Amino acid sequence: MSPQTETKTSVGFKAGVKDYKLTYYTPDYKTKDTDILAAFRVTPQPGVPPEEAGXXVAAESSTGTWTTVWTDGLTSLDRYKGRCYGIEPVPGEETQFIAYVAYPLDLFEEXXVTNMFTSIVGNVFGFKALRALRLEDLRIPTAYVKTFQGPXHGIQVERDKLNKYGRPLLGCTIKPKLGLSAKNYGRAVYECLRGGLDFTKDDENVNSQPFMRWRDRFIFCAEAIYKAQAETGEIKGHYLNATAGTCEDMMKRAVFARELGVPIVMHDYLTGGFTANTTLAHYCRDNGLLLHIHRAMHAVIDRQKNHGMHFRVLAKALRMSGGDHIHSGTVVGKLEGEREITLGFVDLLRDDFIEKDRSRGIYFTQDWVSLPGVLPVASGGIHVWHMPALTEIFGDDSVLQFGGGTLGHPWGNAPGAVANRVALEACVQARNEGRDLATEGNEIIREATKWSPELAAACEVWKEIKFEFEAMDTLDV
């Protein structure tokens, strides 16, 4: 990088520029239980040594700047600086390295995902000495975890609220996502819930547009929920999207949802922002609302393998900021998601303690202590033939969400919901009887069609539909 140039002054300060690795590359450092640990995929510019690049990341995401400054002498740089404590090559990538960086906990405001990300994934991602930079994983120390409320309620409380156990929950995104009037929208919600689904959902870009203002949608959806509950005897819900242009408008919508008595609201946490999301999560905890999270915009951040931020980091951040559900990919549907990587961050969402496992992309052991878990939502291009695989991959603590796979049924919305509920119940029963969903899945569905004409019709419509593309996000081998 820049040549070393130093100028002595009468007060002992040495001005000029020095290599980052002299201060920020510390391979002998022993990490502390209170450190936030980060694994960065670093692609240095030609001629920049990996140690210098790693130290540059540590410096620029903590206390460093491009030149030596005299005010360094007014604080304990050794106490507050980030440290690159390890560099390892990436298999099959000659120009990429994994740089491990430790950050002292005092660099971060308590319970503020916004502040954590501003430092760790801030200006450093535009640093000229790096061709590309990707944050692969974070280890959040328990001391920092305990400063967060986390999900509004968590998995067990949600099941208790809904009185639904022993199976995945079923959902449906109302389609077309834009253009319906509030009354027609509410009609579709009712038909899906009446047919056997647990939830219906606003699409992520349904806010308050001219064709359907938010208050009208909330009222018609609440009417649909109560009517379906009365007819089925089951607790139902619709994810009312409270995302808005200002935090004040977002909270106004959440308050109105609570006044209507509905069980759940929704937020687009990346486009809405972490500050707004945490504010909404706190309100939901205090007022008995579940909070569904959509990850719109995530692929802008996480899809490129050499630059950006892996979704497992965004998933951890969401668990800290707060949300009871989050979309996580399907493995088998139309959206990106390799199986082992997906299951890795699904465990990070649901479990209390997750061991380091590089075969699933998990770089650090993570202990969430008492932070509630988040239900992963499998959604995007799935239909009844996928039900065995989804049940086997995601297990009971998940939401399986079929939009087109419900509303595209040839007989209508309610029969589409019936088909999905029958398929799910058949898969759960078969699994509980000891059958292998991975190998017997199609046969289990075919058997169920014999006593469900709705399922038989759905199977016929979607029998040839597959999404067979190579995943962009793959493990390093």
UniProtKB/Swiss-Prot annotation:
PTM section of the record: The disulfide bond which can form in the large chain dimeric partners within the hexadecamer appears to be associated with oxidative stress and protein turnover.
Keyword Ribonucleoprotein among UniProt keywords: no
Organism per entry: Carthamus tinctorius (Safflower)
UniProt main location, coarse: plastid
Propeptide feature ranges: 1-2
Residues annotated with N-acetylproline modification: 3
Site feature (Transition state stabilizer) residues: 334
Record's cofactor remark: Binds 1 Mg(2+) ion per subunit.
Parts of the chain that traverse the membrane: none
Pfam family, one: RuBisCO_large_N
Catalytic activity field: 2 (2R)-3-phosphoglycerate + 2 H(+) = D-ribulose 1,5-bisphosphate + CO2 + H2O; D-ribulose 1,5-bisphosphate + O2 = 2-phosphoglycolate + (2R)-3-phosphoglycerate + 2 H(+)
Modified residues (N6-carboxylysine): 201
One Gene Ontology term from the biological process aspect of the record: reductive pentose-phosphate cycle
Protein family membership: Belongs to the RuBisCO large chain family. Type I subfamily.
InterPro entries with a match to the protein in the record: RuBisCO (IPR033966), RuBisCo_large_chain_AS (IPR020878), RuBisCO_lsu_C (IPR000685), RuBisCO_lsu_C_sf (IPR036376), RuBisCO_lsu_fd_N (IPR017443), RuBisCO_lsu_N_sf (IPR036422), RuBisCO_lsuI (IPR020888)
GO cellular component terms, A-Z: chloroplast
Function: RuBisCO catalyzes two reactions: the carboxylation of D-ribulose 1,5-bisphosphate, the primary event in carbon dioxide fixation, as well as the oxidative fragmentation of the pentose substrate in the photorespiration process. Both reactions occur simultaneously and in competition at the same active site.
Positions annotated as active site in the UniProt record: 175 (proton acceptor), 294 (proton acceptor)
Subunit structure of this chain's protein: Heterohexadecamer of 8 large chains and 8 small chains; disulfide-linked. The disulfide link is formed within the large subunit homodimers.
GO molecular function, one term: magnesium ion binding
Protein name, UniProt field: Ribulose bisphosphate carboxylase large chain
Binding positions for substrate per the UniProt entry: 123, 173, 177, 295, 327, 379
EC numbers, comma separated: 4.1.1.39
Zinc as UniProt keyword: no
